[in-house]
Amino acid sequence: SSWATKTVDGPRPSTDEPLAHAGYRRYRQEMLDLGVQLYEIVPSQVAQAKNLGPFGRSTGRFHAKAAAVDGKVIFIGSLNFDPRSEKHNTELGLLIRSPELAAQLMKMAELVQAEAAYRVRLSEDKSRLEWHRSTPEGDVVLTEEPDSTWWQRLWLNLIGPLVPEDAL
């Protein structure tokens, strides 16, 4: 049996909380090694994207979570998928069986990927992450997180190992 997993997430500047991003960063390499396709939103591009409708008017900051499973079921909500959220947060989500909504959600994800996201990949020698994006001016490849400063990356590198999983 085969399966495909694709995720669209926000880079450091678009997250509500740097500690949550530090937790996500821990797993990027492993997810890529497992074949997960990672896309990270470029906040500055969301508002400029032509085909995103009301989503394009957002600032590119995220709190909502959405997932489509097998093209039949979707999850939409604000609940994080972690033990702390299950036990302590009052956020929620809806699980809806609807192939039509799943198709719409996947189409939106594809538009975001095409117009306002970098695809995260491993470098050819698999020693580092790279952020790839096609633009009208040509292909762009970055070796540092988009829209992040040296200080932000240093801070995340310092605090990342110190943040316990159950605090994320």
Label for each model-derived stretch:
Residues 2-168:
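PLD/PLD-like phosphodiesterase catalytic module centered on the HKD motif
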